[in-house]
Amino acid sequence: MDAILNAEPELRLAAFLSVLAIMALWEIAAPRRRRDIPRVIRWTNNLALVVIDTAILRLTFPILAVGLAVIAEDRGWGLFNTLEVPVWAAVLVSMLLLDIAIYLQHVMFHAIPALWRLHRMHHADLEFDATTGLRFHPIEILISMVFKLAVVAALGPPAVAVLLFEVILNATALFNHANISLPPSVDRWLRWIVVTPDMHRVHHSVDPRETNSNYGFNLPWWDRLLGTYIAQPAKGHTGMDIGIEQFRTTRDLWIDRMLVQPIRGPASGYALDMSGYSKPQSEQALDSQSDKTNIPDTEERD
């Protein structure tokens, strides 16, 4: 086990590159939506942002989540290091608690205007594919890591649980942002156990009522239990508009514009309280029927 934990950076990088390659090939072979912006523009800038984020993170924090979990185990910090529970139970419960913590963190970034200024860069992507799942402002990455380290210190989860969670979260973030086509029957059942691309795409709708839904990155249960789940976008997956209203030009997709986006324009328009919007009966019926049957869009799939 020590060897696996010591090889954490290499394992995470290998998993990341493997899943990214699979998603990229899948997007080319079976895209869900038509691509209007040249891939080279978005992918070059989104991937450059990953390099910047990773460098800043490594320079800022001497240890990350897995390393802190190892220290917590050695020093008896956190809840699970004070309880006598089987390792398998501690691993499973820790991964569940870490996942709901990430869900709540995501909600927080939508609820607080200053944090939304950072997070909206992720939403301002004008298309939705695997690299969208990598597009986060460096300051958001730093704040997220502080939050994650605090959760790890409080819980004291087994280090292997944190490693598994990080690898799975990275993989599912690439998967559920991918522009890939799944058979309707597969999506209908899969979204009960993992956030699917069709489920998460709703969250990237330009409509604030849909933006403030489907916060889960990994497990879909929290959205369903806490009332933030929307089954399908009102305009359908090939008809919906991706992004936010403030930043709609191709120039906004370049990294220099992305990095200064938090200080550009107001942070209004996507307040979390809009998630309490009461849908018309027609939309509620559509969501209910779509969730049961997952009828594909009437538009031809690209």
Residue ranges and their predicted role:
Residues M1-E10:
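Short, strongly hydrophobic alpha-helical membrane anchors
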Residues L11-A21:
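Structural signature of hydrophobic alpha-helical transmembrane segments
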Residues L25-T44:
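Membrane-interface helix-loop junction between the first two transmembrane segments
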Residues I41-T54:
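Alpha-helical transmembrane segments and their helix-start/interface "positive-inside/aromatic belt" motifs
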Residues V51-L64, L79, V85-G239:
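Membrane-embedded catalytic scaffold of the fatty acid hydroxylase/desaturase
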Residues I63-E73:
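Membrane-helix interface motif
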Residues K235-D302:
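Cytosolic-facing loops and C-terminal tails of multi-pass membrane proteins
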